[in-house]
Amino acid sequence: LRKLFENEVIDQTTYELALAEKLPGKPFPLPEITPHLTEKLRNDHKGTQLTSTINYSLQQQINEIARKNYEALRQNEIHNLAILILDVNTREVLAYLGNSPTTAEHDHFVDIIQRPRSTGSILKPFLYTAMLDEGSLLPHTLVADVPTSVNGYSPQNFDKEFNGAVPASVALAKSLNVPAVRMLQDYGLQKFYHQLEKLQQKNINKSAGYYGLSLILGGAESSLWGITNAYAGMASTLNHFNSSSSEYKPKEFLEPIYKLNKKADFGKNQFQPEVFHAGAIYHTLKTLEEVNRPSGEENWNFFS
């Protein structure tokens, strides 16, 4: 201030008034409740002030859940995780945790929600739904779980065992690989690829032939953002069907919303679904309720 006054940048009155003011307190660090979403907002909407749809209480809960699980998982050299929670009815992002509270050595700054990763077995329910939808499969239809080789490709189940003939619903609940490959071959690779396009799996962007039958076993990549939205779209299809006298919306698989006061436009009611009929979705979701839990958690439903 003295230099400004001596150099006649400010007059004496301004100088004396400035000296009389109390010094401001030191700035406190900004809360890092959801840093990866903050970075996404900054990149997507530069120079714009906006309010997110994040539920503060829920976000704090998942941050704590992630912290506790990270402490356990890192003992097994698992250093990264992500959590995304959407409201199925509004498609709003309620909680967004892009990575674990790990270190820079393990890339804590990387937003795993947006990064493409191997799909593993997460596409199997889509294939099951598609086959139910066209009538080529029923939940109790027996599918073969036997040694299989297709043009030199020989899928294996996780336990390296074969179960013979199993109901399709059981094959999905147990996430059996061999039946999934055989089902994809029966349904049609190209046809399933087009279904994934309808489900907005934008990271699966090479030709169907490039992926081959391994598409159903993690041979492709998708993001948690895209996968979560696809499952939300299926649930939303069922919800709208049940609440609208058996009608559908034309835009069930629209992008998740993270800006407050932006409303999802699912379109006007129609008689045909955007992708899958409600009945096929219902049976798929019921089957997924029977998914085997890890060893030691078999009786989870008694405590839920």
What are these regions (language model features)?
Residues 1, 5, 24-28, 45-53, ...:
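Second-shell loop/turn segments in exported
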Residues 1-60, 64, 156, 194-208, ...:
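Non-catalytic, structured segments within soluble enzyme domains
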Residues 1-9, 101-104, 170-177, 185-188, ...:
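Peptidoglycan glycan-strand catalytic modules in the bacterial/periplasmic cell-wall system
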Residues 4, 62, 91, 112-143, ...:
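Active-site SXXK
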Residues 11-16, 109, 132-150, 187-193, ...:
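Short, well-structured active-site flanking segments
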Residues 27-42, 137-192, 236, 258-290:
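Conserved catalytic neighborhood of penicillin-recognizing serine enzymes
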Residues 52-73, 83-87, 96, 103-113, ...:
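A penicillin-recognizing enzyme superfamily signal
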Residues 77-80:
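Short, small/polar residue-rich loop motifs at catalytic or cofactor-binding pockets
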